[in-house]
UniProtKB/Swiss-Prot annotation:
Annotated keywords: ATP-binding, Cell inner membrane, Cell membrane, Cytoplasm, Membrane, Metal-binding, Nucleotide-binding, Protein transport, Translocase, Translocation, Transport, Zinc
Gene of this entry: secA
Note on cofactor: May bind 1 zinc ion per subunit.
Family to which this protein belongs: Belongs to the SecA family.
The keyword Acetylation is annotated on this UniProt entry: no
Protein name: Protein translocase subunit SecA
Biological classification of the source: Bacteria, Pseudomonadati, Pseudomonadota, Alphaproteobacteria, Hyphomicrobiales
Major localization listed first in the record, in broad terms: membrane
Enzymatic reactions: ATP + H2O + cellular proteinSide 1 = ADP + phosphate + cellular proteinSide 2
Cross-referenced InterPro entries: Helicase_ATP-bd (IPR014001), P-loop_NTPase (IPR027417), SEC_C_motif (IPR004027), SecA (IPR000185), SecA_CS (IPR020937), SecA_DEAD (IPR011115), SecA_motor_DEAD (IPR014018), SecA_preprotein_X-link_dom (IPR011130)
Any one Gene Ontology BP term: protein import
Its biological purpose: Part of the Sec protein translocase complex. Interacts with the SecYEG preprotein conducting channel. Has a central role in coupling the hydrolysis of ATP to the transfer of proteins into and across the cell membrane, serving both as a receptor for the preprotein-SecB complex and as an ATP-driven molecular motor driving the stepwise translocation of polypeptide chains across the membrane.
Length: 946
């Protein structure tokens, strides 16, 4: 009560913050008349002037007003668009490193240019993050006109670029790209062996478009670069063959927690099946030898009971492709881990791909927290404001709309069954289609979108085939004639290639579009259709300029006329009076785009995104959700009392209940799910932070090693530390000489250092101490390495040391990641022993890291003490080639298998190879003669070190 009164008199915290920007908005507006008078060259010259002021000590905040005014003027001259005052406020929020929540159609893409330009003046590179390659290309080309006009360079990172192209794009002042590409480039950079091969610069400032989708919806999905392990496809197929022999009493499914477990009867049945197939070791399924078998059975059960085709994944080109649960988009290249993807492949009877070993991984949560400054834009973030601040320290600022929202959001209609619900949706579509009001129907999955499509087909509607040219001609013709077309379009992961086109034309009179959650985020639905989309498509084959101009005028006339038709597509509804009240009255419901939701999502934010497709920039619109008690949210999380309440009300088939109380009950169910998902993500982050801290140490160490011309001091320190540990283990401090394990020490020195030292004789000397013994061993080891340097030369030795150190570090880090994954899978069991799993994980992970560090010292020392380069007769020592690997993030395949790493650029022709200079050898086949001139095959000479 008191809080509400305070807000009434003083405004909310959000209102006060927005008002605080007004003085700077006024200052920017005051500069406009002055900038209008400048020539293009004078306006462009302001960029160099701003950079000079920064160099002289001014801050970016000092330059905000003149820089924003400059961008606004440049946008007017290049795009014909002028930033509104509210867009200037959005730009300030982004510059301050927070999230600007702006409604659909308010020009988020244009808003970003303000903060991007200002921060790009620092010369450290600004990253703009989009959700797909199409938007990255579109926005970089579109907004790049502004930056280019002002003398700044723009790059774009999309799938399929090589390292040279990526490096060029990252070197630009502004770089557009997808979250996946940025993350994978970071991981790949930290698998390189030379600094000059790395493509990214240090992480300075990023603006994330659709920030809620990337930082919340995808937060649980780690980016993983992996390599294949042994092929066990037959085993997966064998296990999958058992599943049809189980019935529902053999396992328990918990949809809420998304878990499935075998019952006692199920265990006995599986044991019998495994024994008959010769796959059971020992007597019981739960004997230690069968741990992996149990794991595979559990994954097969999950694949069959918790994952649904066309909802969680689709089968395309004989491959199982994951569907993003929030966007509805396909995620080619992404694979479920821990054998689940292989279980799905066996279930669908497609080729089972080998399991993968993680080579490097990071979550978006930890990747984006590396930036000095992070900001974001979205139309819907307020419901997740707490999470965004808690994890990323980003505040959500709601930016006022330029024009007030004129959309009517109606109460939900709730039916008993899905069949009744779909019948009601069909009836609503038919009424809207009769008055030519465009309809966008949102569904939760491909499966549901195709069920609805079949409903429409069975009632005389035809699906538009976007594979044909001029696919929308019949829709346009019907709209011109003022008649319903009875045509509909489907937008889901199967048709994602035509996504932008389908969405852009969803505002044409009489258009019916069925969309999964993806709903074409990033593409506006303009009433009457999109001029920008139609003109290039419909004039592509016209060469005659006069004819092209006539066609463009016809399209413009179409779009304007169509817009008028849609605006007038209002519905007049007669409200039945209550008994004894006044006569019936009529209510006019607005035209514009009509959003129909076919079910509620777990997250209110996803529902708000769907509603937000309508009512852009002050346009009228409507939205309504049609629900049934058989929907997933209602069935899994809804209250059982709701069903009994509807039964008591005596609802007849086809009748709906409509009441604000229902909306509130649903919102509470959604809040419960959101809170649960937040807890899951927060807990995931706590565990991932442990690995992330270790990842930072390893990756920073790699960069430092690559920066150093020589790592001789590092490997010497490692050698001494290893010898210290070895001597301390066998010759305890303050122990008598008789208690020393001299034989064990001598054996270890021979095994690791390849040195046969008279340790037993030294131990017999009168008065010798452990410290003296340590010094003698270290001196002998140092002399051994000094002899190698003298033999091969310091340059060759420095190269060998660095290569062995980096390759060994990478190998052990990969093994360490596997250990951490295994630890994470079982650490939850510690909770049964009244121990905190997180604290236990931290302790165990630290111990594993310490062990890895000790193993690194031993492995590097052992390899360097043993490594030999056999020189050709009467020739100087030469450098052994080393193998490098670059693993593709999508396939996990090694793209550079057996590629030779050399000190210089490879020669293009074998004739240019200098036997004395390995840098000139280039790529060598393992069965070729060795270029050194020894007469041996490369694999038996220098190639054996690869």
């Amino acid at each position: 009560m008191i809080g509400a009164l305070a807000r009434k008199f003083f405004g909310s915290a959000n209102d006060r913050r927005v008002k605080g920007y007004q003085s700077r908005v006024n200052a920017i507006n005051a500069l406009e008349p002055e900038l209008i008078k400048l020539s293009d060259e004078e306006l462009k010259a302001r960029t160099a002037d701003f950079k000079k002021q920064l160099a002289e000590g001014k801050t970016l905040d000092d330059l905000l007003v003149p820089a924003f005014a400059t961008v606004r003027e440049a946008a007017k001259r290049t795009l014909g668009q002028r930033h509104f005052d509210v867009q200037l406020i959005g730009g300030m929020v982004l510059h301050e490193g927070d999230i600007a929540e702006m409604k659909t159609g308010e020009g988020k893409t244009l808003v970003a240019t303000l903060a991007v330009y200002l921060n790009a003046l620092a010369g450290k590179g600004v990253h703009v993050v989009t959700v797909n390659d199409y938007l990255a290309r579109r926005d970089s080309g579109w907004m790049g006109q502004i930056y280019g006009f002002l003398g700044m360079t723009t790059g774009v990172i999309v799938h399929g670029l090589d390292d040279a192209e990526r490096k060029t794009a990252y070197a630009c002042d502004i770089t557009y790209g997808t979250n996946n590409e940025y993350g994978f480039d970071y991981l790949r950079d930290n698998m390189k062996y030379r600094l000059e091969d790395m493509v990214q610069r240090p992480h300075f400032f990023a603006i994330v478009d659709e920030v809620d989708s990337i930082l919340i919806d995808e937060a649980r999905t780690p980016l993983i670069i992996s390599g294949p392990l042994d092929d066990r496809s037959d085993f997966y197929n064998t296990i999958d063959g058992f599943l049809p022999k189980l019935d529902k009493t053999d396992y328990d499914v918990d949809e809420k927690q998304r878990t499935v477990t075998l019952t006692e009867a199920g265990m006995e049945k599986i044991e019998t099946l495994l024994r008959d197939a010769g796959q059971l070791k020992g007597e019981s399924l739960y004997d230690v030898e069968n741990v992996s078998v149990v794991h595979h059975i559990n994954q097969a059960l999950r694949a069959h009971t918790l994952f649904t085709r066309d909802k969680d994944y689709i089968v395309r080109d004989d491959e199982v492709v994951i569907i993003d649960e929030f966007t509805g988009r396909m995620m080619p290249g992404r694979r479920y881990s821990e054998g689940l993807h292989q279980a799905l492949e066996a279930k669908e009877h497609v080729q089972v791909q080998p399991e993968n070993q993680t080579l490097a991984s990071i979550t978006f949560q930890n990747y984006f927290r590396m930036y000095e400054k992070l900001a974001g834009m979205t139309g819907t973030a307020a419901t997740e404001a707490d999470e965004l601040f808690d994890i990323y320290k980003l505040e959500v600022v709601e930016i006022p709309t330029n024009l007030s929202v004129a959309r009517l959001d109606e109460d939900d209609e709730v039916y008993r069954t899905q069949k009744e619900k779909y019948a009601a949706i069909l009836a609503e579509i038919e009424r809207a289609n009769a008055r030519l009001q465009p309809v966008l129907v949102g569904t939760a999955s491909i499966e549901k979108s195709e069920v609805l499509a079949e409903f429409l087909k069975s009632n005389g509607y035809k699906q538009i085939d976007f594979g044909k040219e001029n696919a929308l001609d019949k829709l346009y013709a019907a709209a011109r004639a003022g008649k319903p077309s009875k045509l509909f379009a489907v937008l889901n992961a199967r048709f994602h290639e035509q996504e932008a086109y389908i969405v852009a034309e969803a505002g044409v009179p009489g258009a019916i579009t069925i969309a999964t959650n993806m709903a074409g985020r990033g593409t506006d639905i303009k009433l009457g259709g999109s001029l920008e989309m139609r003109v290039p498509k419909e004039t592509a084959g016209i060469e005659d300029e006069a004819e092209k101009a006539r066609k463009i005028e016809q399209i413009k006339a179409d779009v304007e006329r169509f817009r008028e038709i849609v605006l007038k597509a209002e519905e007049i509804v007669e409200i039945e009076p209550a008994k004894g009240s006044k006569p019936a009255k009529t209510v006019t419901k607005p035209g514009g785009l009509y959003i129909i939701g076919s079910e509620r999502h777990e997250s209110r934010r996803i529902d708000n995104q769907l509603r937000g497709r309508s009512g852009r920039q002050g346009d009228p619109g409507r939205s309504k959700f049609f629900l049934s008690l058989e929907d997933d949210l209602m069935r899994i999380f809804g209250s059982d009392r709701l069903d009994s309440m509807l039964q008591r009300l005596g609802l007849q088939e086809g009748e709906a209940i409509i009441h604000p109380w229902i909306n509130k009950a649903l919102e509470k169910a959604q809040q419960k799910v959101e809170a649960r998902n937040f807890d899951i993500r927060k807990n995931l982050l706590k565990f991932d932070n442990v690995q992330n801290d270790q990842r930072k140490v390893i990756f920073d160490q790699r960069v430092d090693l690559m920066k150093d011309d020589s790592v001789a001091e590092t490997v010497t320190d490692m050698r001494h530390a290893f010898i210290d540990d070895l001597v301390a283990k066998h010759v305890p401090e303050h122990a008598y000489a008789e208690q020393w394990d001299v034989a064990g020490l001598k054996e270890e020195l021979k095994r690791v250092l390849d040195l046969d030292l008279p340790v037993d004789d030294w131990a017999k000397e009168e008065g010798i101490a452990d410290e003296e013994l340590l010094n003698r061993i270290e001196n002998r080891a140092d002399e051994h390495m000094a002899a190698k340097v003298a033999q091969w030369g310091p340059d060759v030795m420095r190269y060998v040391e660095k290569t062995i150190l980096l390759q060994t570090l990478d190998h052990l880090w990969r093994e360490h990641l596997i250990m951490l994954d295994h630890l994470r899978q079982v650490i939850g069991l510690r909770g049964y022993g009244q121990r905190d799993p997180l604290q236990e994980y931290k302790t165990e992970a630290f111990n594993l890291f310490q062990e890895m560090s000790a193993h690194l010292r031993e492995a590097v020392t052992a390899q360097l003490m043993r490594v030999e380069i056999v020189p050709p007769e009467q020739e100087a020592p030469v450098l052994p080639p080393m193998e490098a690997h670059k693993f593709d993030p999508n396939t996990g395949e090694d793209e550079m298998a057996l590629a030779s790493v050399t000190l210089g650029a490879p020669a293009s022709d074998a004739a240019q190879r200098d036997p004395k200079n390995p840098a000139s050898w280039g790529k060598i086949g393992r069965n070729e003669d060795c270029p050194c001139g020894s007469g041996k095959k490369y694999k038996h000479c220098h190639g054996r070190y690869a």
